[in-house]
Amino acid sequence: MSFPKILLGGTMKYLIADLVTELKPKYSYLQTLAKPFEYFGDREPEISISLSDEYLNSMLKKMVSGTTIGAAEEFSYAGKFCQKIIKYNAMLIHSSAILYNGRAYLFAADSGVGKSTHTAIWRKAFGNDVKMINDDKPVVRIFDGNAVAYGTPFDGGSGIANNISAPLGAVVFIERGESNSIRKAETPEIIKRLYFSTAHFVSRATADKMLTNFEKLITCTDFYILTCNMDISAAYTARNEIVKN
């Protein structure tokens, strides 16, 4: 039986979503993901998170059988981070995020629908013009009416967690269908879908602020509903509507 590598050392600074963040990862899984985000500048930490062994072990017991303690640590730090960023006009959107034509596009879907499959189709269709930002937990922040998407070191087990940021082009909610079509999303369905994407990070203390963040994001971002199959034509259907020249 192999065990995750336990790290020696103390708290490290990282720059995640342009927030100086102190983390103390104990296992190599999160340390490897977080390394590209290491920060050596003079800014003071805005977020500080340290999790005890007792907390990590309690989280591990709640997770799917076979989950490693390293993966449980990554999941736990992700949850705490996403709670703390809410006051900074930021939110996690559970999605697969790509960089295309200088902008970030986030594709969100219920588990099993195929958000990662869809962004893989984009890579097949458009090759090196597409770069992956994060395949599970990108963050969006709003600055003076403009939204920016950020990669994070939290990968949800996908292995894709790059330190890339870009202006947000659109958020697309995916539904599976036999043929491909896309339409603009209405405000009530946007709020409902955003809520399900972020609900497990929201507490009573942060609920009002998160709703304010939703309102700000809806004001400055295009949202779409994409009904699609797994054919390469689905990427063209989405691209032709959401990418603005």
List each language-model region with its residue ranges:
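Conserved lysine of the Walker
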Residues: 115
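Hydrophobic positions on the alpha1 helix immediately C-terminal to the Walker A/P-loop
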Residues: 118
